[in-house]
């Protein structure tokens, strides 16, 4: 398996999905794992459960500035070359990947994320069967970002959308199977690359006991705050939703749960009723302390593990329609859907006003999770 991020600790949607496949494969044979490491990140091997993989190879990415000016300069160069940012960031390590294989032969090779799909050229020489796991569809994500962003940023996303689509058309049909998170994503993949064999493998989380509830007067948004759709969600919620809730509920706290809160500091600083936890060991337990989970995403692709984690905590969810896309959620049954800022605030207030409704929606979400979205249930979709 080759992954651009380590599966452990399984904090965040990408790591959780990758971890689910590592565990699935480890139950069926020996797994050798190749992961990329960002500068300054801890040793991924020390985070893995003992005995989960046979061998781990860590490829260190070169250091680069995370400042806005440096990021803009890098993306300007990528725009000129029409190379999507993540494809560019993880390209050029064929020699290291080949050395990690070291002449071995494998029954299956799994590549995580479409931006690493070009490594199929190296891995395919050693693997009888090649699988590409799409956490989302990059061309769709860039296309949606381009539709909501204005100016130069929107233009860049539209260019990267077309560049991503060209890569998807080229590489997806070259894999034995392509895993998509939902049937709606699978249909999009088939439209982009008609020759690809697509299998729906839903996002899922490990089965967990229902954690004790603290019922603090807190609403929660969880995820990696550095991820562009999450940054946009925080901005939208602060500007269009939070002002309504803050006025109506004078003791209410909005808590951001997840790593890189500094990425959204411009929208959350200066308000003592907005909290940021940073990384947490157990997102489900942290969510169980709250009353409502909010998913105010304006752009997305794939499906949202943040909703699954809220359901695992039996926490009621308010989401935008695109935030809940790909999941069998039903408005008024296991979550509430709202699109505009005022409608979103009204839906949250409706839940805060009724412990009965919170319990009904949270319990229904938990039942749906147990029925369809634990690792063991998701593994039934796989045949390798």
Q: Where are the regions that the model predicts?
A:
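Short hydrophobic beta-strand element within catalytic cores of glycosyltransferases
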Residues: 306-309, 316-320
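Conserved acidic donor-binding segment of nucleotide-sugar-dependent glycosyltransferases
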Residues: 335-342, 350-355
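A short, well-ordered alpha-helix in the C-terminal region of glycosyltransferases
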Residues: 357-371, 381
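N-terminal subdomain of nucleotide-sugar transferases
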Residues: 1-59, 104
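Conserved nucleotide-sugar donor-binding subdomain of glycosyltransferases
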Residues: 67-118, 122, 152-172
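Conserved catalytic-core segment of nucleotide-activated headgroup transferases in glycan assembly
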Residues: 200-288
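Donor nucleotide-sugar binding/catalytic pocket of nucleotide-sugar-dependent glycosyltransferases
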Residues: 129-131, 139, 157-210
